[in-house]
C-alpha cells in the first residue's frame, strides 16, 4: 500500500488533521440511475435542512476552512470542494453527473462535509505521497479549471508534484472510465456530524456497490502522531 507522510508544516499548523487512505481495484462506469437517485436525495435532504449561511458552519467544512486560515489561505476565494458542492445543493442547482467513483465520492462529501481526494493510482508517481503546503508559483492544473494557485493550500504531492488539494484534484491523476486502481484520501480536518469510522464505512460500502471494489486496503495517518 502507498506510504503517506505528513510534513512538519501541517503537523504544526493543523495538528487535528487525519487522513484515511483507501486503495482498491475498481471498475468506474458511468453513474447508474440508482446512484444518481441517492445523490439527488442527499442533495434534497441537505437543501431542506440548512440555509446557505449555515453551509460553512457544518463542522467538517468549518474545520477545513480553519485549516486554510491557519496556513494563510482565504477559504472564501478557494473554497474546499465539499463546501462548494454543499452550496450547490442548497442553492438547488443541478449537479454534474459523471462516473461512478467521482459521484459516490461527491455523495459522501454531501453527507459528511469532508473534502475527499480520488486518484488513478496508476497515474500517481512512486510509492509515497506527502501532505505539505503549496508554494508560491508551484504549477498545478486543477480538474476542469486549469491553473490553480495552490500557495498556502494543503497539497498532497507524489514524486512529480501536486496531485490533490481540498479545493481541487490535479488533472494529471484524475479518474477516468479506464481507471482500474483507485487511491482515495479522506481528509478529516476536524470532527463532522458523522463520526470518522461511519464516513469510512459508508465510502467503502459505496465503492463495493457501485464500483465493484475488490482488494480494499485502508490505513489511517494523523498529524499529531509521530511516523
Region annotations inferred by a language model:
Residues 1-227:
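Charge-biased, low-complexity intrinsically disordered regions
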Amino acid at each position: 500500500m502507498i506510504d503517506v507522510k505528513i510534513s512538519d508544516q501541517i503537523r504544526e499548523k493543523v495538528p487535528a488533521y487525519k487522513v484515511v487512505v483507501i486503495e482498491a481495484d475498481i471498475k468506474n462506469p458511468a453513474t447508474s440511475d440508482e446512484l444518481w437517485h441517492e445523490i439527488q436525495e442527499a442533495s434534497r435532504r441537505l437543501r431542506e435542512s440548512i440555509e446557505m449561511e449555515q453551509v460553512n458552519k457544518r463542522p467538517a467544512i468549518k474545520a477545513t476552512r480553519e485549516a486554510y486560515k491557519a496556513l494563510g489561505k482565504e477559504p472564501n476565494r478557494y473554497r474546499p470542494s465539499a463546501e462548494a458542492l454543499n452550496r450547490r445543493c442548497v442553492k438547488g442547482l443541478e449537479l454534474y453527473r459523471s462516473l461512478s467513483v467521482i459521484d459516490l465520492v461527491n455523495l459522501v462529501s454531501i453527507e459528511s462535509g469532508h473534502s475527499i481526494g480520488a486518484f488513478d493510482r496508476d497515474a500517481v508517481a512512486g510509492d509515497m505521497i506527502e501532505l505539505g503546503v503549496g508554494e508560491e508559483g508551484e504549477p498545478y492544473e486543477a480538474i476542469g479549471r486549469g491553473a490553480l494557485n495552490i500557495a498556502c493550500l494543503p497539497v498532497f504531492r507524489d514524486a512529480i508534484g501536486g496531485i490533490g488539494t481540498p479545493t481541487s484534484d490535479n488533472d494529471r491523476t484524475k479518474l477516468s472510465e479506464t481507471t482500474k486502481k483507485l487511491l482515495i484520501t479522506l481528509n478529516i480536518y476536524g470532527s463532522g456530524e458523522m463520526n470518522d469510522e461511519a464516513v469510512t464505512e459508508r465510502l467503502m460500502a459505496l465503492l463495493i456497490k457501485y464500483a465493484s471494489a475488490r482488494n480494499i486496503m485502508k490505513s489511517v495517518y494523523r498529524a499529531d502522531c509521530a511516523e
